[in-house]
A protein has these predicted regions:
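Conserved catalytic core of sirtuin-type NAD+-dependent deacylases
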Residues: 1-317
Length: 317
């Protein structure tokens, strides 16, 4: 395996001085778009695709994590864009503004206890079983939530980084996000917040007063600016990650796309590479994707439901 990257770090975080309250969702499926029951014929086609291939590159998107309670950006009626006028922070804005960085880290600090405690769902668990069964070459995930690693998958490439690490923009030093939470606890002992909705990258809404009073640390090694080790909108995927993905797609025998519309080019170009190389492509998603015309098989449905229904057949056949 070439340059597999995972964001797993050992949890050492304890909720300390801040009082952070979260309202319980009525269902973990709050952020999953409505869809019809997947047809048995489509289940069989997807099962046969996985049965036939033993070196699959799997590309996952935000649609697989909605079943764990993390919203995506674009799902009709339930995504962040449908529920809020707020948009994700741009890379240039984060780097260029102390005010924007303070707001980002304040929101991220309050959202972290819940975001970091979210558990893998059936999709992550089935992919781990497929990996154990030697069906998977690698999992390329566009998600930053660490859920593949939590499920036990080891062959993971984090295309857009991980929210579970923090990097210095000056010296490139990296620390575990749990360690930063301890530092933020000490710097902000009186922080109190209530939140209704977590964001795809783990932050929440706060009042202007709460943001203005929030203290953000600098890098302990050089005094530089700290940034989550994720690819913000407007940023570029590191070259070594791009090359790792290209290598693994080239040496795979197929591409399986799960829970992604492939709206961002960093994901879509993986489908293009596979198609140009003659690799068969299967897609499981709710709604249209940018690569539908490249796919040999397109199945509509919830990833966790569909994969759970066919996993026993796949793994025992």
């Amino acid at each position: 395996m070439n340059s597999i990257r995972t964001g797993m770090c050992t949890p050492v975080y304890k909720i300390g001085a801040p009082t952070i309250l979260f309202r319980t969702y009525s269902s973990i499926l709050t952020f999953v778009p409505k869809c019809e029951q997947t047809k048995d014929s489509d289940l069989l086609r997807l099962k046969e695709f996985i049965d036939k291939h033993n070196n699959i590159c799997i590309l996952t998107g935000a649609g697989i994590s909605t079943e764990s309670g993390i919203p995506d950006y674009r799902s009709e009626g339930v995504g962040l864009y449908a529920k809020s006028s707020r948009r994700p922070v741009l890379y240039k804005d984060f780097c260029g503004s102390d005010v924007i960085r303070r707001r980002y880290w304040a929101r991220n600090y309050v959202g972290w206890p819940r975001f970091s405690s979210i558990e893998p769902n059936n999709t992550h668990k089935v992919l781990k079983k497929l990996e154990d069964a030697k069906k998977v070459r690698c999992i390329v995930t566009q998600n930053v939530d660490n859920l593949h690693a939590k499920a036990g998958s080891r062959k993971v490439i984090e295309l857009h980084g991980t929210a579970f690490k923090v990097m210095c923009l000056n010296c490139d030093r990296r620390i575990c996000r749990y360690s930063l939470q301890d530092i933020l606890d000490r710097l902000n002992p009186n922080m109190t917040a209530t939140s209704q909705m977590i964001r795809p990258d783990g932050d929440v809404d706060l009042s202007q007063e709460q943001v203005e009073e929030f203290v953000v640390p600098s890098c302990e090694a050089c005094g530089g600016v700290l940034k989550p080790d994720i690819i913000f909108f407007g940023d570029n995927v590191p070259r070594q990650i791009v090359e790792s993905v290209k290598y693994n797609v080239e040496h795979s025998d197929s591409l399986l796309i799960l829970g992604s519309t492939l709206t961002t080019f960093s994901g879509y170009r993986i489908a293009l590479q596979a198609s140009n190389a003659g690799k068969p492509i299967a897609i499981l998603n709710i709604g249209k994707t940018r690569a539908d015309d490249l796919a040999k098989i397109k199945v509509e449905g919830r990833c966790g439901d569909v994969l759970s229904r066919i996993s026993t057949m796949i793994l025992t056949s």
